[in-house]
Design a protein with these regions (language model features):
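Short, conserved beta-strand element in jelly-roll/cupin
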Residues: 36-53
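Basic/polar phosphate-binding segments, predominantly the helix-turn-helix DNA-binding elements
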Residues: 166-169, 196-198, 202-240, 252, ...
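Intrinsically disordered, low-complexity acidic/proline-/asparagine-rich linker or regulatory tail/stalk regions
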Residues: 291-296
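Conserved short histidine dyad/triad with adjacent acidic residue
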Residues: 22-38
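Short, Lys/Arg-enriched, Trp-marked, Pro/Gly-tolerant hinge/linker segments that flank
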Residues: 117-128, 143-197, 201, 206-212, ...
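A hydrophobic/aromatic-rich effector-binding and dimerization subdomain
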Residues: 2-24, 75-144, 163, 167-173
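Solvent-exposed, amphipathic alpha-helical segments
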Residues: 49, 131-145, 187-198, 242, ...
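Short acidic-glycine-tyrosine-enriched beta hairpin
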Residues: 57-71
Length: 296
């Protein structure tokens, strides 16, 4: 697997050189992934547990057996407060465009399409999604068992899945506004990289505006429009993500963890943390300890 750095905002996906995609089984006992995006279709097939997926202005709670697709360059975040197991499948847009020339202009959707369907049409859609999930499960089995013929077997299924995506789950061309949004996200890359490297200290609006080369007032509007959250909220999201991981993976005191990650306002921290996880830090740590003693 090609080793690359994955930022917490713009995600650079590590690809398997034999397949040109990323496919793996995720077992998560609890996590928060702040808003980010990538130049790839992302498919999440939840096999056990629950997962909350926020995509720009929408929010969806996935349950066992459900599948969702995230469009390329769409800002999204995920929240896991209970153990889950899922297939994660990421298809780079550049790879897909080799076989589907208009892929960057297509809208892909799996479950929950907005179309009004008759009963026969609805039955057909359910059959298609079940067939799609079955292919993902077969790909997972190959990745887990790794037979000698694994690359050939996996790639055979991969192209079958790509065909299904194009033939059964693409719904027309995206608007021109999508292209403008992608350009705006490109402008934010250095800003988000800077926040990611310096999140554990105070970053002033003047300082971050200079990185963006924007007037501070314009920067605030621009950031909120692109990311769906304010600059300060985003910085706190990054902190919360790191704090959560330390809570469930270390025995460090909460005060030490907060200091490590730059959250100096404890009252605000408690408020933001509870809004994300519906529990106090102590409760999260206790519950996670119980979860990890059981199997999914």
């Amino acid at each position: 697997m090609k080793k690359v750095i994955t930022a917490s905002n713009y995600e650079v996906i590590p690809l398997d050189l034999r397949t040109n995609v990323r496919f793996y089984t995720s077992v998560d006992f609890g996590s928060y992934v702040p808003p980010h995006w990538h130049d790839a279709i992302e498919i999440l097939y939840l096999q056990e547990g629950e997962l909350k997926v926020n995509t720009e202005s929408t929010s969806r709670n996935l349950h066992s057996g459900q599948c969702t697709l995230i469009q390329p360059n769409k800002v999204h975040s995920t929240l896991c407060t209970r153990p889950n197991k899922a297939i994660v499948f990421q298809i780079p847009l550049l790879f897909l465009e080799k076989f589907v020339p208009d892929a960057s202009r297509l809208t892909f959707q799996l479950e929950g399409t907005p179309r009004q369907a008759s009963q026969p049409e609805w039955d057909r859609q359910k059959t298609q999604i079940n067939q799609f999930k079955e292919k993902l499960t077969q790909m997972q089995f190959i990745m887990d068992t790794k037979p000698d013929e694994a690359p050939l077997m996996f790639n055979t299924l991969l192209f079958d899945v790509l065909y299904q995506l194009y033939h059964n789950f693409s719904f027309g061309f995206t608007a021109d506004s999508t292209s403008r949004q992608n350009q705006n996200l490109e402008k934010l890359k250095p800003v988000l990289d800077y926040i990611n490297c310096n999140y554990n200290r105070a970053i002033s609006l003047t300082e971050i505006s200079r990185i963006a080369m924007f007037d501070p007032k314009y920067f605030c509007r621009f950031f909120k429009k692109c990311m769906g959250t304010t600059f300060l909220e985003y910085q706190n999201d990054i902190r919360i993500s790191h704090i959560y991981q330390d809570l469930v993976s270390t025995n460090d005191k909460i005060s030490v963890i907060l200091e490590r990650h730059g959250f100096t306002n404890y009252k605000l921290f408690r408020k933001v943390f509870y809004e994300h996880f519906g529990a106090t830090p102590t409760e999260v740590r206790k519950n996670n300890s119980v979860y990890q003693k059981t199997t999914l």
